[in-house]
UniProtKB/Swiss-Prot annotation:
Gene designation per UniProt: mpl
Molecular functions per Gene Ontology: metal ion binding; metalloendopeptidase activity
EC number: 3.4.24.-
Protein name: Zinc metalloproteinase
Main location: secreted
Catalytic residues of the enzyme: 350, 437 (proton donor)
Annotated propeptide span(s): 25-200
């Protein structure tokens, strides 16, 4: 028999009593015969249990990506499609060992049958106009730091309504920094989804690299910096990595296009006016080095992309955030918060949002959004592991401030620490997109439990492996548990996988 891609499709029998109790589930290798031969084809979904809808509709899936890791495991990402259009459903991932055995299948296995209920009647131009109208703006009145503010405008299927939509991504810096995802019905022009995705808390060979020193918020420390000299000025531009690291001064504006690369007449950036920029520049380099040296990830996107930091955002802004392209730091109001670039955990947290964006792409709502926040917190700890707290360095009141977060004791700082405390909040800005910050305390506590059982070094490796290869964009807490178990098994064996399971079960995730 022939398929479009590969010949010889094998149908696999499964062990009995397989439990498909949740929508997004996974299948372990113990449920697959050891002699299965991987086909690198959606037909692999025929190996699923009869209770999985994806089994009967495997022909509706398309392979989006194929990646081989350093263990030789190949990871395939599949997405549901209909009439040539992809959906916004969760992906399905199939993981194949070097000897062509399927070791793991995960994602939303209860999907497959899809019938589009509308037609395309409005133009792309009309859809973009309606997207801007939905946020009270027009394309002519927003400014983007780089290029067109319309970054994506593809037609996909909204899985909830089964309708074709223009999926439009807007990123701009003026009149305020924003990163919107807006879905416009392709027939009626109705807005089906609207969410601001901000994640809060040219080289010239003649230009030479120079060493420099600077002082950040901690005036007692001198930080070594890499800078670039052009003519008679030294700029906070680090060219010692494959990806350029640049630090800009916004001078209290909110439009990143007004940002200027921080410069000085000497290579001593020690005056107080440079402190926020020095911290941002120094810590961005340290985060780059962490991912490069510990996880072999070249910059945040894995491709040597640039890291741009903007300091002095707005006036007394109590925030720092990744906007989908760069990181922006407020100066704090000085009463409650110091400049946000002065905390290595916060810099690590925000830049990890970029790593998440370029890997699992965890959607910023509900449990997947809480996982997004949690993984950013946990890697913030991995990057600065001297304590279990995130953000205490920017709090004027230090440990007494209730707005910091603790991986060890989330409930001490107004976060849930167990599923019994989980809050199902509205998927709105007022509801914190389903309580992503409050509920992230649950996976944070699970991470703490894992670290105490396996140690930091093993835990950071399995967390990165799960993030890069196993988590899907709509992953729930149970999916994260299983993804981390599989990553632990890959790297350290069954005993480590069991300890990961225990760590999550201790917070009520079974």
């Amino acid at each position: 028999m022939k398929s479009k891609l590969i010949c010889i499709i094998m149908v696999i029998a499964f062990q009995a009593h397989f439990n498909m109790a949740v929508k997004a589930d996974s299948v372990g290798e113990e449920r697959l015969r050891n002699n299965i031969q991987a086909k690198r084809n959606p037909a692999d979904l025929k190996t699923l249990p009869d209770s999985c809808e994806a089994k009967d509709f495997y022909k509706n899936f398309k392979i989006l990506d194929m990646t081989k890791d350093k263990l030789g495991v190949t990871h395939y990402t599949l997405a549901l499609s209909s009439d040539g259009y992809l959906t916004d459903n969760d992906e399905i991932k199939v993981h194949v060992t070097p000897d062509n055995k399927i070791t793991f299948i995960n994602g939303d296995l209860q999907q497959g049958q899809l019938r589009i209920t509308n037609q395309i009647k409005i133009t792309e131009k009309n859809a973009i106009e309606k997207a801007f109208e939905a946020i009270g703006q027009s394309e002519a009145h927003v400014k983007s730091y780089i290029g067109n503010p319309v970054k994506e405008k593809e037609i996909i299927i909204n899985s909830r309504t089964k309708r074709l939509v223009y999926n439009i991504k807007l990123i701009f810096a003026e009149p305020e920094v924003a990163s919107w995802i807006i879905q416009v019905d392709a027939e009626t022009g109705a807005i089906l989804k609207k969410q601001n995705m901000l994640s809060e808390v040219e080289r010239a060979d003649t230009h030479k690299d120079f060493q420099a020193l600077g002082k950040g918020a901690n005036r007692l420390l001198q930080r070594p910096l890499h800078v670039m000299k052009i003519n008679d000025l030294f700029y906070l531009v680090d060219r010692t990595h494959k990806g350029l690291i640049r630090t800009f001064d916004l001078n209290h504006k909110t439009d990143a296009s007004f940002g200027k690369v921080v410069s000085n007449k000497t290579n001593m950036f020690t005056d107080p006016e440079f402190s926020s920029a020095v911290d941002a520049h120094f810590y961005a380099s340290e985060v780059y080095d962490y991912y490069k040296n510990v996880h072999q990830l070249e910059s945040l996107d894995g491709k040597g992309g640039e890291i741009d930091s903007f300091v002095h955002y707005g006036l007394n802004c109590n925030n720092a955030f990744w906007d989908g392209r760069e990181i922006l730091y407020g100066d704090g109001d000085k009463k409650n918060f110091k400049p946000f670039s002065c905390a290595k955990t916060i810099v690590g947290h925000e830049l990890t949002h970029a790593v998440i964006q370029y890997s699992a792409g965890l959607e910023y709502e509900g449990q997947s959004g809480a996982l997004n926040e949690s993984f950013a917190d946990v890697f913030g700890y991995f990057i600065a592991p001297n304590h279990w707290l995130i953000g205490e360095d920017v709090c004027v009141r230090g440990l007494r401030d209730g707005r910091i977060r603790s991986i060890k004791d989330p409930d001490k700082y107004n976060q849930a620490a167990h599923m019994k405390d989980y809050e199902s909040l509205p998927i709105t800005e007022e509801g914190d997109w389903g309580g992503v910050h409050f509920n992230s305390g649950i996976p944070n506590k699970a991470a703490y439990n894992t670290i105490t059982k396996l140690g930091k070094e093993k835990t950071e490796q399995l967390y990165f492996r799960a993030l890069k290869y196993y988590l899907t964009k709509k992953a729930q807490f149970t999916d994260a548990k299983k993804a981390l178990q599989q990553a632990a098994k890959d790297l350290y064996g069954e005993d480590a996988s069991k300890k990961v399971a225990e760590a999550w079960e201790a917070v009520g995730v079974n």
